[in-house]
Amino acid sequence: MAFVTMKHLLAEAKREHYAVGQFNINGLQWTKAILQAAQKEQSPVIAAASDRLVDYLGGFKTISAMVGALMEEMAITVPVVLHLDHGSSAERCRQAIDAGFSSVMIDGSHHPIDENIAMTKEVADYAAKHGVSVEAEVGTVGGMEDGLVGGVRYADVAECERIVKETNIDALAAALGSVHGKYQGEPNLGFKEMEAISRMTDIPLVLHGASGIPQEQIKKAITLGHAKININTECMVAWTDETRRMFQKNGDLYEPRGYMTPGIEAVEETVRSKMREFGSAGKAVKQQVG
């Protein structure tokens, strides 16, 4: 089964008031866990490679081939998007598209809005020629993302409206108080701004840094137009905690399969739980029919 784009996937989710989870891949076994979770839950899924981890994972072509081969070997039948997360430049997005990624995020959020729009339009124009969906970001999601530390800067409503109108993107990540990594204290999303941005742009919104956000805030974000929710930290913590427990119980373990398997199983269970929480479980059949 070929990769699908986010365009119709997220439009359907927004219309039906649920969200599709993006789960970042951190290796082959990690990818298997995400795909297996999606198949068991009959949920569409977005498997993402962060730009900063692409080289670590073997490059764009390796990632595309690995995910595609796993889908075939595992007989995956649910819709799978292969997405570039936080693409750092138009060139990196082009490389991902040429390697077979079905979706890319161009992150120009650290630049002035005019430059952000120009970068995004360049990517969107190239992606449109290849049938690939595009996500952009306005404002700054704080915290740590693969070693990059930044502060929170709320998205401006007018800037969000501009980037959507001028670039023809498929999804918008509007920074509204979420952070990458672990939260210090209670997350506090900007729902007033969220409602205004959703109304003005009328496209699927993306919630970055969703690990650790309380379920009631997640549900409210979905009702206010979020159709894609990104999870990475919770999966990493689940894997690390379980792997650490394995070594605490048996410090003599040395076979990777022996000490990694419980952690991978924890990742799968975390992904399944999030799919149920986001309301995407059981939606694969409708997505395929639609």
From Swiss-Prot:
Catalytic site: 85
Domain of life: Bacteria
Entry GO MF terms: 5-dehydro-2-deoxyphosphogluconate aldolase activity; fructose-bisphosphate aldolase activity; zinc ion binding
EC numbers for this chain: 4.1.2.29
Alphabetized PROSITE patterns for the sequence: ALDOLASE_CLASS_II_1 (PS00602), ALDOLASE_CLASS_II_2 (PS00806)
Catalytic activity: 6-phospho-5-dehydro-2-deoxy-D-gluconate = 3-oxopropanoate + dihydroxyacetone phosphate
Residue(s) carrying Phosphothreonine: 233
Keyword terms: Lyase, Metal-binding, Phosphoprotein, Zinc
Pathway terms, separated by semicolons: Polyol metabolism; myo-inositol degradation into acetyl-CoA; acetyl-CoA from myo-inositol: step 6/7
Needed cofactors: Zn(2+)
GO biological process: fructose 1,6-bisphosphate metabolic process; glycolytic process
Similarity remark: Belongs to the class II fructose-bisphosphate aldolase family. IolJ subfamily.
Function in brief: Produces dihydroxyacetone phosphate (DHAP or glycerone phosphate) and malonic semialdehyde (MSA or 3-oxopropanoate) from 6-phospho-5-dehydro-2-deoxy-D-gluconate (DKGP).
Record protein name field: 6-phospho-5-dehydro-2-deoxy-D-gluconate aldolase
Organism: Bacillus velezensis (strain DSM 23117 / BGSC 10A6 / LMG 26770 / FZB42) (Bacillus amyloliquefaciens subsp. plantarum)
Taxonomic lineage from the root: Bacteria, Bacillati, Bacillota, Bacilli, Bacillales
